[in-house]
Amino acid sequence: MARRRYLVAYDIREDRRLRNVASCMEGYGERIQYSVFVCDLSDQEAVLMRGDVEARMKPSEDSVMIIDLGRAGDSSRFLFLGHHEKLPTSAAVIV
């Protein structure tokens, strides 16, 4: 089963929902900035992640952006300036 790399960024307006979404995302990928995660997921895991995040956000106030970056493990689309977190090299761990 092919895995894809996703960049997930969010703007959650309320602290409780923000913590809830962040906690959810920690089960799917690696945090690379405060509200930005990189996730290497199968198609099924991507569907689960989307549903889990949608259940925790308020669509009328919050925003989540999910970008498909191509095959998992390909870091060639990233360019960092200054200090940055290491990109994930392993599959997602769903708790």
Residue spans for each PLM region:
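Basic nucleic-acid-binding interfaces
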Residues: 1-7, 13-95
